[in-house]
């Protein structure tokens, strides 16, 4: 693990950052020798990175693998060994010059095929997206219609409840409006002065009512037997009174006044 960390640090520092800065200096000074040197190095280092990805997966178990990789990077950069220029001139340049046409043909074919494949996949992706959008829209319309129906039913129930509440509120306001009127009417009736005649009439009526109440209370206090005796006596008295009245009328018959003719005859 420690060797892997050290190897990665060495590759990044000495294999990438330092050659990048040296290439910048070569471009700035326009030195052809340095420019060619670092161009050869970058070609070899690109091949090294591609081979490194494969060897890290296959040969990482090999002992001293990471130490050998550090030594190889230093060999490429050393101005004494000039490993990058040696590898490029002996192996890379001859192989690339021999396979250059084939490589160019592969590149052009890859471009054309990549364009065709990209267009094909793009069309398929658009078709899939369109079908997905249509299906989602249909499902969404169904869900929205169901929700709208449920909302419409809820709105109708809410409207009915609001109408009932408004009617109840109108009744309450009507009763609340009539109550102050009734109170004001009673206040005006109480405030209006009562005439003296009406007061005397009311007082006489109240006296009569009090007398009648006292009489009723006396009658209730009396026993049933005295009531029967009083009733029989009262029944006999009117009959006697009627006979006395008839006799008096007979006795008190009016006397006839003497006429003028009788007066003349009686006169001598």
Swiss-Prot record:
Residues 170-268 are annotated as: Disordered. InterPro entries: TB2_DP1_HVA22 (IPR004345). It is a multi-pass membrane protein. This is Receptor expression-enhancing protein 2. Its main location: membrane. Belongs to the DP1 family. One of its GO terms (molecular function) is taste receptor binding. It holds the Pfam family TB2_DP1_HVA22. Residues 249-258 have a biased composition (Basic residues). Keywords: Membrane, Transmembrane, Transmembrane helix. The chain crosses the membrane at residues 1-21, 35-55. The lineage of its organism: Eukaryota, Metazoa, Chordata, Craniata, Vertebrata. It comes from the Eukaryota. One of its GO terms (cellular component) is endoplasmic reticulum tubular network.
